């Protein structure tokens, strides 16, 4: 049965599955839905039009579903959707969306969100990501599946981080990171720059040698040649056309990401 601590304040209109746990001094608002097996720690606030799936763990002092930190916001009923089996640690803040975008902030499944992380309005976070402590993403940011954000990293609004990409700790990211690429600060400052393909991460996730070699070749065309961005993208597209079925999928993801960039890519 639902375990709600006597000091917790759960609005009668909130919808909680029968085995949800809510810790001491926590607050759950009227428009909140929480799925089976989710545990809400102590001193935590879950508010707004927020839907949380099954098997999540939300740590103490987290603020989930708060209003956007956007001066254009006028109390519209925007939403936050969180999937299943996510770990959201203490003092994390995740805000709802704005009507200037989709009106939705979303977090997928199996994400590991460490302490003091901020996920702003209208962000889209995929599955199996890792946000190290104090990672901060501004509004409208997209984070692909299996991406890793290092501690104390900061991401500018509207930036995209591709699947399986990695952002180093204490890095400032102002442009897109293509999938499978490592971006990190260098000796000249904290602005993130490209540092190769995330080879170790790809091996751990089952990518074979041929796929990794193809991605390395694409990376060299984009970053290690004298080609312009458009020329490099065309060469990578040609490489895709020559690839077998096994190597085509990651190359297609790489090419499609480049084609969709609005802010440009890290350089």
UniProtKB/Swiss-Prot annotation:
Q: Which GO terms describe its biological process?
A: lipid A biosynthetic process
Which keywords does this Swiss-Prot/TrEMBL entry list? Acyltransferase, Cytoplasm, Lipid A biosynthesis, Lipid biosynthesis, Lipid metabolism, Repeat, Transferase
The molecule here is called Acyl-[acyl-carrier-protein]--UDP-N-acetylglucosamine O-acyltransferase
| InterPro entries assigned | Acetyltransf_C, Acetyltransf_C_sf, Hexapep, Hexapep_transf_CS, Lipid_A_LpxA, Trimer_LpxA-like_sf
Q: Which HAMAP family match?
A: LpxA
**Top-level enzyme category:** transferase
Q: Which GO terms describe its molecular function?
A: acyl-[acyl-carrier-protein]-UDP-N-acetylglucosamine O-acyltransferase activity
Gene that produces this protein: lpxA
> What CDD domains does the entry give?
LbH_UDP-GlcNAc_AT (cd03351)
Q: Which organism is it from?
A: Cupriavidus necator (strain ATCC 17699 / DSM 428 / KCTC 22496 / NCIMB 10442 / H16 / Stanier 337) (Ralstonia eutropha)
Q: What does this protein do?
A: Involved in the biosynthesis of lipid A, a phosphorylated glycolipid that anchors the lipopolysaccharide to the outer membrane of the cell.
Q: What EC number(s) does the entry state?
A: 2.3.1.129
Please name the pathway: Glycolipid biosynthesis; lipid IV(A) biosynthesis; lipid IV(A) from (3R)-3-hydroxytetradecanoyl-[acyl-carrier-protein] and UDP-N-acetyl-alpha-D-glucosamine: step 1/6
